[in-house]
């Protein structure tokens, strides 16, 4: 998936600030087994992180120590057994996508921690940092970075079916 590195400490400070204020649009792809309740939608939950379990829990209403989490999802492909979701992350919380999709009834393929029944053969989960877009802080030109899908037959098939 997409990983950004800064060449200098000044560039790192600028990049970190852009992430902090939401100037970087991050898109993720996730493969889920269950059909989402709608073709697209916005999920708004309050997440509580547990350090001991290294897990977050999603609630529909505000809670003490909870942080608001917002994402937008859209079904962009489907196979006989799985759905490919494009996820536009509005906030960046601990395990946010994993937690919110599980709360919606759509745990990510291979994600045992958040309710998928079995692991993937490689032990990973089917969540991919697909792209990052932002305005370059110096040149003011748009920057768009798109990562290829993982070298896995299901990912390749889902990408081919993408609408």
Question: Which residues make up each language-model segment?
Answer:
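RNA pseudouridine synthases
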Residues: 1-163
């Amino acid at each position: 998936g997409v990983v950004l590195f800064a060449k200098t400490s000044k560039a790192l400070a600028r990049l970190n600030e852009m992430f902090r204020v939401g100037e970087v649009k991050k898109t993720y792809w996730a493969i889920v087994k269950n059909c989402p309740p709608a073709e697209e939608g916005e999920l708004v939950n309050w997440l509580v992180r547990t350090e001991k379990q290294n897990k977050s829990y999603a609630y529909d209403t505000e809670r003490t120590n909870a942080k608001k989490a917002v994402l937008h999802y859209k079904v962009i492909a489907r196979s006989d057994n799985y759905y490919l979701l494009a996820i536009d992350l509005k906030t960046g919380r601990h395990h946010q996508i994993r937690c919110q999709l599980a709360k919606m009834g759509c745990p990510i393929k291979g994600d045992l921690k958040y309710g998928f029944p079995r692991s993937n053969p490689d032990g990973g989960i089917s969540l991919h940092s697909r792209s990052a877009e932002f305005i370059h802080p110096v040149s003011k030109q748009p920057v768009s970075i798109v990562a290829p899908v993982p070298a896995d037959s299901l990912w390749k098939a889902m990408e081919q079916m993408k609408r």
